UniProtKB/Swiss-Prot annotation:
Main location class: cytoplasm
Organism the protein comes from: Caenorhabditis elegans
Keywords annotated in UniProt: Cytoplasm, Nucleus
PANTHER family given in the database record: ACIREDUCTONE DIOXYGENASE (PTHR23418), INACTIVE ACIREDUCTONE DIOXYGENASE 1-RELATED (PTHR23418:SF10)
Official protein name in the record: Probable inactive acireductone dioxygenase 1
Family the entry assigns: Belongs to the acireductone dioxygenase (ARD) family.
One Gene Ontology CC term in the entry: cytoplasm
UniProt key word Electron transport: no
Annotated GO biological process: L-methionine salvage from methylthioadenosine; methionine metabolic process
InterPro entries attached to this UniProt entry: ARD (IPR004313), ARD_euk (IPR027496), RmlC-like_jellyroll (IPR014710), RmlC_Cupin_sf (IPR011051)
Length: 159
């Protein structure tokens, strides 16, 4: 996982890093303090360790339902979906995502017009707290497979 402050008004391709200049990286601890976002590294190759970590998160967050969500250029209406995912949104429950394959960005907005970009990759589990404005996009590779966790079954494919 890599985390940095984004430029205030990013222009051009949203899938690029959009660092402020000079780059201002932050740690997972700082991300937690600034935005309440939690981060866990999950070893997907160690089944016992993975199950233990996921079980703890599921219990702590009252998870009762999971699904797999894949974003790739081959999906129907890819460009429209990416526009939709990049629109800032605020959820009524925590957004819990484990990257199973690929890489993507979650942008979080702890203060008005102050975005922090979080690049997550295989094995990264991120918990964005309910009520925090956030958005989602891919990297230029246009591929990510995410396991999502919910406290109830949801309909449709939200980002």
């Amino acid at each position: 996982m890599q985390i940095w402050h984004m430029e205030p008004f990013p222009c051009g391709d949203r899938r690029l890093p959009h660092h402020v200049f000079p780059p201002k990286k932050i740690t997972t601890t700082q991300l937690g303090q600034l935005a309440g976002v939690q981060y866990y590294k999950v070893d997907l190759d160690d089944t016992a360790s993975m199950k233990k970590r996921l079980s703890a998160v599921k219990t702590e967050k009252n998870v009762t339902f999971t699904d797999m969500f894949t974003v790739s250029e081959t999906m129907l209406e890819f460009d429209d979906k990416m526009e939709q995912f990049y629109e800032p949104q605020v959820q009524k429950e925590d957004v819990i995502s484990l990257v199973v394959e690929g890489t993507c960005y979650y942008d979080v907005e702890p203060e008005d017009d102050s975005w922090i970009r979080v690049q997550v990759e295989k094995g990264d589990l991120i918990v964005i707290p309910k009520g925090l404005s956030h958005r989602f996009t891919t990297t230029p590779q246009n591929f990510v497979k995410i396991q999502r966790f919910f406290s109830r079954k949801v309909e449709g494919n939200q980002g």
